[in-house]
């Protein structure tokens, strides 16, 4: 509930930016949180990254306006990447487990994508080229792979 409240608060504030977070050198498990505010506030870009565990990596690139990206990682050796261009796009990646790999690429207008991985060794990729597309991938086992492309 606390994370959802924080997410909503930052969304309303419209924290802009591009964010990258890694936690390679933590001696113990901690919560690593990053919000970056590098671009103009008029773009209304938000990148929120939360990490618990070790050796997790998250990368977000945003070009456009009204973009929101949320990445949550718990475990070890998880990789997440979001690449957003265009306007009014939303991307969400949640990883629980180890050695999961997820990426979302969005362009155009009004797209929503979510990847939820619970297990180990999963791979998922969502690419959205069109307008007003929605895609959700849920992987609850280990060593699963999927690629979704929407035009």
From Swiss-Prot:
GO biological process: cell adhesion
Secretion signal, residue range per the UniProt entry: 1-21
Subcellular localization: Fimbrium
GO cellular component, one term: pilus
Keyword Signal in annotation: yes
Domain of life, source organism: Bacteria
Keywords: Fimbrium, Signal
InterPro entries: Curlin_rpt (IPR009742)
Family statement drawn from the similarity comment of this UniProt entry: Belongs to the CsgA/CsgB family.
Cited function: Curlin is the structural subunit of the curli. Curli are coiled surface structures that assemble preferentially at growth temperatures below 37 degrees Celsius. Curli can bind to fibronectin. The minor subunit is the nucleation component of curlin monomers.
NCBIfam families: PRK10101.1
Protein name: Minor curlin subunit
